[in-house]
Amino acid sequence: MKKNQRWLVLALLYAGVGAASAQTADVLYVRSLAANCANCHGTNGRTVNDSAVPGLAGMPRDYMVTQMMAFKSGARPATIMHQLAKGYSDAQIEQLATFFAAQKK
């Protein structure tokens, strides 16, 4: 293999690793956001039996976004969720909703 071809192959491999690392970092970031919800809503949004707190696993994405935005704006009354929702950007809320919608109930 010629020297230029080797550099090209190495560059392409490095670019692929970088993209995979970025995807992994994104997944870990969203999982770290979701971990904050586990205190009340259970690991990965699965509540324990007889919990008064709703499970988030499998919740429709658009519904969760709507509810979180309502908490954030104060339109939906809550004991604590309105304060927690204000700590997330709109993009983070959308990421969380996508994450929980993908979880099995």
Locations of regions flagged by a protein language model:
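The canonical Cys-X-X-Cys-His
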Residues: 35-43, 96
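Detector for the c-type heme attachment site
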Residues: 41-46, 101-102
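Sec/Tat signal peptide C-region and signal peptidase I cleavage site
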Residues: 18-24
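Residue-level signal for mature regions of secreted extracellular proteins and peptides
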Residues: 15, 30-33
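Bacterial N-terminal signal peptides
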Residues: 9-16
